[in-house]
From Swiss-Prot:
Enzyme class: hydrolase
Catalytic machinery residues: 374 (proton donor)
Cofactor annotation comment: Ca(2+). Can also use Mg(2+), but with lower efficiency.
Disulfide bond positions: 331-360
Protein name stated in the entry: Probable mannosyl-oligosaccharide alpha-1,2-mannosidase 1B
EC number assigned by the record: 3.2.1.113
Assembly mode: Monomer.
Amino acid sequence: MHLPSLSLPLAALTLATPSLAYPYYRTEQPLQNNLAQSRANTIKEAFSHAWDGYKKYAYPHDELHPVSNGYGDSRNGWGASAVDALSTAIIMRNATIVNQILDHIAQVDYSKTNDTVSLFETTIRYLGGMLSGYDLLKGPASGLVRDSKKVDMLLTQSKKLADVLKFAFDTPSGVPYNNININTHGNDGATSNGLAVTGTLVLEWTRLSDLTGDDEYAKLSQKAQSYLLKPQPASSEPFPGLVGSHISIETGEFTDAQVSWNGGDDSFYEYLIKMYVYDPEAFGEYKDRWEAAAQSSMEHLASHPSTRPDLTFLASYNDGKLGLSSQHLTCFDGGSFLLGGTVLDNDDYIKFGLDLVKGCHETYNATLTGIGPESFAWDPNSVPSNQKALYEKAGFYIQSGAYILRPEVIESFYYAYRITGEEQYREWIWNAFVAINKYCRTSSGFAGLQDVNAANGGGRYDNQESFLFAEVMKYVYLAHSGDAEWQVQRGNGNKFVFNTEAHPFRVR
C-alpha cells in the first residue's frame, strides 16, 4: 500500500494470449520449464537494468529520475531504492547487487535527515526491507553472503531505525503521529491518523521484537492496532469489520465512518489476515476481524458495472451511499481474498478474490498500453462523453490515467497463480511486464506514464519509485521462478508472509 497522491517530479517481447475463462483449482503447471526460465532471465535483466541506472546516476540517493538521469530524495535520502531492492536481489540470487546494498546499509545514519519522516513509509520500505533481508539471508538464502557480520548488521540497523522512530507513538492514546521530525521529536500537528497508516506497522514492528527479543516494538504497534480492532464509537463501523478512515491521536476513537479498500485504508485490511498467517495462535482476533470485513465487503461493497455485469469491483461507502470508483492501489484486494481463502480453506473467499482479479485485469486489458490507470470509476451517470465507448466495452472509465509503476494488479495476479495453479494468471503477469517494459523503460531505468490510454503512454514522469524494485520486479519474477520457501503457498504451508512492500518475513 502507498498513499494515493501522485509524487511526480529490451528486446522485443511478444504478448501471450490469455484464455477467456479460468478453471477452478486446476493442478498447478510445472514452474520449471524452458519458457518460464527464459522469461525469468528476461525479468532479471530488467531488474539489473534498473539497478545499474540507479547505481550510475542516483546512488546513494532515494530514487532515479530515469528520463533526465537525475535523482530524488523523497524518502529522507537514506537510499530507499537500494534498501527496497535488497529482498528482490536476494530472491534473484544476485550476490553482487546484494553485497552492494549491504555495504550501503551499513553506512546509513538513520538519525540524520533534514526532511519530515513518514513513520508509515519508513516502516514498510526501510524497516521492512532490512528485516526481510535478514530473514532471507539467515534462512533460505544463507549461502549468498559469506560475511555473517554483514547480515547481522541488518538487524542492528533495523533496531537503530526503530529507536529513532518510536517517539512517534508517544501520544495520549498510543495512536502514533505519522509525519515526524526526528531531530526535534516534533510532528506536523495532526489531530488524526489514517487507517492504513496506523494499521500497517504491526507486522514490521512485531517481527523486530521477535528477532531482537525486545518486546517494546511489538507493544507499541499492537497498542495502536488495538483501537482499530475494537472501533469506537459504534457508528464508525457501519458494517461488521468495515471501519472508518481516520482515528483521533488524542483518544483513539474514529473520527468518521467512511469505508473503503482504497489507498489510505487498504493495507489495514491486508495486514489483518497477514498477521494471522504470521502467527495463527497469537493473532486469531485479527483473522476474525478480516473475516468480518471480507463478508461485509462481499455483501455490501461488491459492485458490478451496468455495461459489464460480469466484472466485480469494490465500491466505497459513506453515509448510506456507495462510491462507484476505485484505484490501482485497491487492486491488491483480490490477492487478500485469495490469501484469506486458502489459509482459511474458504472457497467463497477464493471465488470472490478471483472475481476481483478479473475486474482489475480488465483495467489493464482495455487500455491502449495494456497497463491500468491510477484511478477509475463505473458510475453510469458520470461517464465522460469521450469515454462512453470505453465504458460500454470495458465497464469502467478513467479518472486518472497515470501509471507510476504500481504493483497491486500484478500482485493479485501472483496470488491467483500461486493459489489456483492456473497458467492464465501467469500469462497476465507476463503481459503486464511486457507492457511495462515496452512503454516505461528508458536508457537508465523505468519511468511512470502520464496516460495509459494514450499512444505511447501519453508521455513520461521523470521518476522511478523504489517499489519498482521491491514489488513489481519481485512479483513478476516469483511467478516465473521455481518453488521456494518464500513463495506464497496454498493452505497453511506458508513459511513467509509478505509485508505491503512485498518484503517477505519468516513466520513464527
